[in-house]
Amino acid sequence: MAAEIHSRPQSSRPVLLSKIEGHQDAVTAALLIPKEDGVITASEDRTIRVWLKRDSGQYWPSIYHTMASPCSAMAYHHDSRRIFVGQDNGAVMEFHVSEDFNKMNFIKTYPAHQNRVSAIIFSLAAEWVISTGHDKCVSWMCTRSGNMLGRHFFSSWASCLQYDLDTQHAFVGDYSGQITLLKLEQNTCSVITTLKGHEGSIACLWWDPIQRLLFSGASDNSVIMWDIGGRKGRTLLLQGHHDRVQSLCYLQLTRQLVSCSADGGIAVWNMDVSREEAPQWLESDSCQKCEQPFFWNIKQMWDTKTLGLRQHHCRKCGQAVCGKCSSKRSSYPVMGFEFQVRVCDSCYDSIKDEDRTSLATFHEGKHNISHMSMDIARGLMVTCGTDRVVKIWDMTPVVGCSLATGFSPH
């Protein structure tokens, strides 16, 4: 069922502790059980499984429950030991797990959506279960009565969700690349604002209520940090992945962001440094360096008897430039560009060698990652994906210490 991996610890990379196999289809969610050597998984194979580590070091299923429909999302509340499972048919089901994690009792079904559930969050304080789905809506339901309290529709599939417990604000990412901030009330809601910055569908969100920062990952392979608390519209772009960003986790104590992408890439971003906002791209009818016309500028092409050029943009200054004036490439990590991007010649000359020092570390998960979650207190991470494999990682060599105690393993 599960193999215990004895990797030689290396100070610079995540250590693979265990690999769990046995699912018959893609694993859509995997969550570590706090203070236990256990993992809860939900899969397209219609099963919910609770895996506990045995004396042999291997993980074996102590609970194996088959659902009526493929499982598409999951939330777990440890203090009350409640599991909420979203399904492909739109229903959300609630279960209660026994104290020894050997038995799971069905509580109720919530008719939350008309189509696949994409994300679930449970608020114990409000007694709400909030969910998003491919029926283009966010719904919130009362866990006491099981009744629908409200729903709000979007123009495209709602793909991910975060919720601020104190203010009852929900953040919903969708397939159009937009993030909507909603204030949820008992039977209604109001749209506060929409955030636009990604060029692809939003795949994941992470909300840090302490610094009031929202992080989003998308199919444009990028992460954006939205400084909600600063109230100045400040955003930071982070580009280092080569595939769709699928999962995020912000470590507030160490100011590090962990992100995972579909190709198995694991990135750890240092957010405890002074970063710069990437500039808005400027528009011009001619190169802002050599003044040669771009190909749609027919009048200047005719007047100067020159061929029109393609428009490009310098990632550092945002100016519209031709290919000749932006022939060089450079990384610029302080602006979030961890790999080489197009810069104009004058910006290239202004970038010093120390400016190219990476502000992130990149690692290989060696499987397709569709979902990741962390037990931040223990520095553990679990990843899962379409290869049906669940991997448990020790992230303390990468993030520096055991986050709860400040104890360094080295």
From Swiss-Prot:
WD repeats lie at residues 22-61, 66-105, 112-150, 153-192, 197-236, 240-279, 364-403. The modification Phosphoserine is found at residue 408. The keyword Zinc applies. Transmembrane segments: none annotated. Gene3D superfamilies: YVTN repeat-like/Quinoprotein amine dehydrogenase, Zinc/RING finger domain, C3HC4 (zinc finger). SUPFAM superfamilies: FYVE/PHD zinc finger, WD40 repeat-like. One of its GO terms (cellular component) is nucleolus. Zn(2+) 1 binds at residues 287, 290, 322, 325. It holds the Pfam family WD40. It comes from the Eukaryota. A zinc finger (FYVE-type) spans 281-352. Zn(2+) 2 binds at residues 314, 317, 344, 347. One of its GO terms (biological process) is positive regulation of toll-like receptor 4 signaling pathway. One of its GO terms (molecular function) is zinc ion binding. InterPro entries: G-protein_beta_WD-40_rep (IPR020472), WD40/YVTN_repeat-like_dom_sf (IPR015943), WD40_repeat_CS (IPR019775), WD40_repeat_dom_sf (IPR036322), WD40_rpt (IPR001680), WDFY1/WDFY2 (IPR042234), WDFY1_FYVE (IPR042733), Znf_FYVE (IPR000306). The FYVE-type zinc finger domain mediates interactions with phosphatidylinositol 3-phosphate in membranes of early endosomes and penetrates bilayers. The FYVE domain insertion into PtdIns(3)P-enriched membranes is substantially increased in acidic conditions. The FYVE domain is required for its function in regulating TLR3 signaling. This is WD repeat and FYVE domain-containing protein 1.
